[in-house]
Amino acid sequence: MTKILLIRHGQVEGINPERFRGREDLALTERGRREAQSVAHRIAAAWRPSAIYTSPLERCVSTGAAISEACGIPTQVLSELNDIDYGAWQFERYDEVEAAQPALFTAWFTTPHLVRFPNGESLQDLVARTANAMRLLLQYHVDETVVAVAHDSVNRAFLMQLLDQPLSSYWWLEQQPCCINEVDVVDGRVRVKRINDTHHLSAAAAHLSGPGLPECPNE
C-alpha cells in the first residue's frame, strides 16, 4: 500500500485584501510558521514518511522544511506541485479583477471548469499536471508513505481525480492552511481516508491561547 499525505502550506503574507496569489512567492506569516510546526509534529507522530515533496514556492518549501526536521528526512522540489498559473491575473486584487472583467471573474467562482486565465492555466491544465505528479509518486514510492506539500488548487485537483468528481466540483473541496489529506492506494484502488483535517491546529491553538480562539481562516 502506498500512502500519500497531501498537505497545504501554512498561512501566508499578502492575504488582505484578497488577491489571486497563485505563483507569487510569498513567505509564511508567524501564524503560518506555527501551523507548519503543528502539522510537522502530527505527521512525525502518526506516520513514518520515506519522502517529502514540495512545490517550488517558498511557502511550501518552508512548510516542508518543518516536516523534514520533525521526520528526519530531506525534502525534494517537484515542479508539478506548483500553484495554478493565474497569468495576467497574478497577484491582482479580487475587486480590481471583478471591476475589469466581471463576466470572467464570476465564471471562475461559478463555472471554474470553463475558465482559462488570460495568459495562464485552466483547470484542465492543472489536473493534467497533478495527474503526472501522482503517477511519479506512485511509481517511485511503492508501499511507502509520501508527503506532498502543495497549494489549495493543487490539492483540490488531486482530490477531484481521486474521488472521480467533475472539474465543476472544484469549489466543493475546502483546503485550510496546513490541512492533511490522507490517501491510500492499493493495487490501483484508491481510498481517501481524510480530507482537510486540521485537528492538530485546533489543539496547538488551544495550547497556546486557551479556549475561545477563532478557527483558522482559509488563507
PLM features: residue spans?
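Acidic, low-complexity terminal tails and accessory targeting/binding regions
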Residues: 2, 73, 84-98, 139-144, ...
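Amphipathic, non-transmembrane alpha-helical scaffold segments
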Residues: 29, 33, 57, 98, ...
